[in-house]
Amino acid sequence: MHGRLKVKTSEEQAEAKRLEREQKLKLYQTATQTVFQKRQAGELDESVLELTSQILGANPDFATLWNCRREVLQRLEVQKSPEELAALVKAELGFLESCLRVNPKSYGTWHHRCWLLGRLPEPNWARELELCARFLEVDERNFHCWDYRRFVASQAAVPPAEELAFTDSLITRNFSNYSSWHYRSCLLPQLHPQPDSGPQGRLPEDVLLKELELVQNAFFTDPNDQSAWFYHRWLLGRADPQDALRCLHVSRDEACLTVSFSRPLLVGPSTETLLLMVNESPLSVEWRTPDGRNRPSHVWLCDLPAASLNDHLPQHTFRVIWTAGNAQKECVLLKGRQEGWCRDSATDEQLFRCELSVEKSTVLQSELESCKELQELEPENKWCLLTIILLMRALDPLLYEKETLQYFQTLKAVDPMRAAYLDDLRSKFLLENSVLKMEYADVRVLHLGHKDLTVLCHLEQLLLVTHLDLSHNRLRALPPALAALRCLEVLQANDNAIESLDGVTNLPRLQELSLCNNRLQQPAVLQPLASCPRLVLLNLQDNPLCQAVGISEHLAELLPSVSSILT
């Protein structure tokens, strides 16, 4: 064995590493304690910079120590000469770069660099752009570096066209770069501002076509990369709908006026203001939500005094003015009539689809054909399938309804982990289509049975519905938004999986409610029905609660105003 190098055993190596770690930890704790002691004593000098450098050089994510360095640098600013300060800043920038090499995604390091450059009279922004380019060359998805680059570009007033060209170079090198795609979505509206384009900033047709060609190259190259699909969705996205007062309804029986809006809003003295004019005279009223809770809501209502509803005049004119939304709506209650209303048409306003020009429709049709071609090559690509569904919705939801449902089935099979989300999205689209069909038929009856619905959406659009059939679906609850259905008289929700009735409250006209074959377990879940003053028929057959002894007597006590309860 003489003359041979001794090799440490694994136990010896482990022990050596343990001792080394203990030594490093001891030095780390000692240095940290010294820094805190000096800070507490107000000894903010260059020795603190040296101590924090030792720690941050190994662990750049110690936020408190970056705060200490800033405090020291602020004190040294007034003590050092301009030449000494310039040398100190240069050294600090070099130290920061070394920290970034240790951890390129260190929040504290990037923030400290922003702070430091913000205090310089003439920062070298070109150097900072070069620094960003170097780090993005190593990792083009480093969003910390992207944030810093946006800061630098803003401070240096770099033209958006130059930054767009920079994203071109990175995307060309690697399509899978979410940050580059996102940056493009910020830059393009700046380069091509469009009047009345909305907050999302729609693009001119020629620019849109060029971007679509670029993103198509991306998802045809790597169909499974989601970044290009997200950008594609942004390109074809719709602007937010304009603020609008959708429907105004007046009921003589309930002495109530109800109004629905395009978005939830909070009405009050310090928030949104609604003005009510009756026969061109202002009327002071108190606004409330259907469920009585003071929170943002699509639907608001108010009580009307008897004088505004009497039959002495041939008609009464009601006008609601939404001051913040710059919108108003007027309806007339004729003599001898019990109700009057005025509403926007979902078919005319295209509430559930993009508002498209002829050129844009042509573009979307072309995109749909391209995605179908890709789907033939990649039949199990979930992003492609979802995009096809959304494009069909944007083009013509009723024309493509049957085909859309087929694509949903395929998508659920491909992506079973998101089956519940897809079921809810499918339910949303089916309800939208049903609202459109109801308006085309000009009726107040809505049949949503046998549609396999899992959720109810857009209930604020059903303000005037009198009969609603939700039977044979997969609903687990009737949501609080159901209180928006102020005209509802008959509700059928048989053969679902309903466990809660919290949403069936304060429905002033509800007379018949059928809940056969659901999952209502305890009589207490029926308590909300007591708030429906005209409810006379309740069908609870084939629910678990019907098996309880004495259930008929219990329900009669719980709901004394309901004359017929079937169990």
Curated annotation (Swiss-Prot):
Residues found modified as Phosphoserine: 98
Name of the protein in its database record: Geranylgeranyl transferase type-2 subunit alpha
One GO location term (cellular component): Rab-protein geranylgeranyltransferase complex
Organism of provenance: Sus scrofa
Homology family: Belongs to the protein prenyltransferase subunit alpha family.
KW Repeat (keyword) present: yes
PANTHER family (alphabetical): GERANYLGERANYL TRANSFERASE TYPE-2 SUBUNIT ALPHA, PROTEIN FARNESYLTRANSFERASE ALPHA SUBUNIT/RAB GERANYLGERANYL TRANSFERASE ALPHA SUBUNIT
Subunit structure: Heterotrimer composed of RABGGTA, RABGGTB and CHM; within this trimer, RABGGTA and RABGGTB form the catalytic component B, while CHM (component A) mediates peptide substrate binding. The Rab GGTase dimer (RGGT) interacts with CHM (component A) prior to Rab protein binding; the association is stabilized by geranylgeranyl pyrophosphate (GGpp). The CHM:RGGT:Rab complex is destabilized by GGpp. Interacts with non-phosphorylated form of RAB8A; phosphorylation of RAB8A disrupts this interaction.
